[in-house]
C-alpha cells in the first residue's frame, strides 16, 4: 500500500528536472558566495596584524582547498584518524578551532578531551564544532596538561609554537599520559630551504624528518615521520 509520502513523491516526478536545475543553481551560487566570503575572512585575519592564534578551518574547507589545490588541512585529520581504534580515549593538545575533533575524530573515538590555551579558540570550538563525545576547555599544556591515561594523543599543527626546550619537556608529560600501546600523532611544517621560518610567529620550525624524530626517540620504540610536499611548503 502506497503511503501519502510515496504518492506525493510520485506526483512530483514531473517537476524533478526543473527542481534539480533550480537547486543546482542555488547550490552553485551558495558555493561561490561562501568561497568569496571565506577568502575575505582569510585576508582580514592573516593579512592584518596582529595575527590570530588559530586558523579557522572553514576557510580551508570553503575557499582555500579549491583555490590553491592544497588539502593538507584534510590530510592532518585523516592521518590522526587512521591511528585510532573505535571507542578510543583521545587527548587533543592545542585543538584550535575544534574542526578536526568534530569532522574527523568524533566519529571513531569514545571520548575526546580537546584543550587550547586561547579562550577565543575554545569559545569558537564550542559554538561551531560541538559533539556529544568532545569536551573543550582552556588549558596551557606547559603548566596544566590534562591528567589521565589516553589511547591517542594528538598534537596537530602546534608543536612549532613551542621552543625546543618546551618540546622536550612536553614529550615527557605526553609519554606519561599514554597507555602502553598508546599513539602520539600530529603534523608540523618544515622551515624554508634558506633556514627562514615559514611563519614568523612560530617558535621552532623543523629542518627535516630527522630533526623532528629526535624529540620522539627517547620516549618511543616505534617512530615514523613522513613528509608531504606541496608547491609552497613541506609538512611532517
Predicted regions and their residues:
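Class I (Rossmann-like) S-adenosyl-L-methionine-dependent methyltransferase catalytic domain
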Residues: 2-86, 91-145, 162-169, 173, ...
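Local beta-strand N-terminus motif with an aromatic residue
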Residues: 87, 150-151
Amino acid at each position: 500500500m502506497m503511503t501519502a509520502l510515496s504518492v506525493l513523491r510520485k506526483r512530483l516526478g514531473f517537476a524533478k528536472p526543473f527542481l534539480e536545475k533550480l537547486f543546482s543553481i542555488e547550490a552553485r551560487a551558495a558555493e561561490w558566495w561562501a568561497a568569496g566570503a571565506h577568502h575575505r575572512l582569510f585576508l582580514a585575519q592573516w593579512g592584518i596584524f596582529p595575527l590570530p592564534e588559530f586558523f579557522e578551518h572553514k576557510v580551508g574547507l570553503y575557499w582555500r582547498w579549491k583555490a590553491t589545490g592544497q588539502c593538507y588541512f584534510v590530510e592532518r585529520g585523516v592521518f590522526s584518524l587512521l591511528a585510532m581504534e573505535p571507542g578510543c580515549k583521545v587527548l587533543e593538545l592545542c585543538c584550535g578551532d575544534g574542526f578536526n575533533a568534530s569532522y574527523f575524530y568524533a566519529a571513531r573515538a569514545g571520548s575526546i578531551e580537546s584543550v587550547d590555551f586561547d579562550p577565543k579558540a575554545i569559545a569558537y570550538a564550542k559554538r561551531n564544532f560541538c559533539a556529544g563525545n568532545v569536551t573543550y576547555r582552556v588549558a596551557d599544556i606547559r603548566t596544566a596538561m590534562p591528567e589521565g591515561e589516553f589511547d591517542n594523543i594528538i598534537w596537530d599543527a602546534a608543536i612549532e609554537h613551542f621552543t625546543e626546550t618546551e618540546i622536550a619537556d612536553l614529550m615527557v608529560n605526553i609519554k606519561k599520559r599514554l597507555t602502553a600501546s598508546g599513539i602520539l600523532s600530529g603534523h608540523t611544517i618544515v622551515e624554508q630551504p634558506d633556514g627562514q621560518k615559514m611563519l614568523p610567529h612560530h617558535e621552532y620550525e623543523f629542518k627535516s624528518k630527522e630533526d623532528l624524530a629526535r624529540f620522539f626517540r627517547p620516549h618511543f620504540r616505534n617512530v615514523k615521520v613522513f613528509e608531504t610536499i606541496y608547491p609552497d611548503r613541506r609538512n611532517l
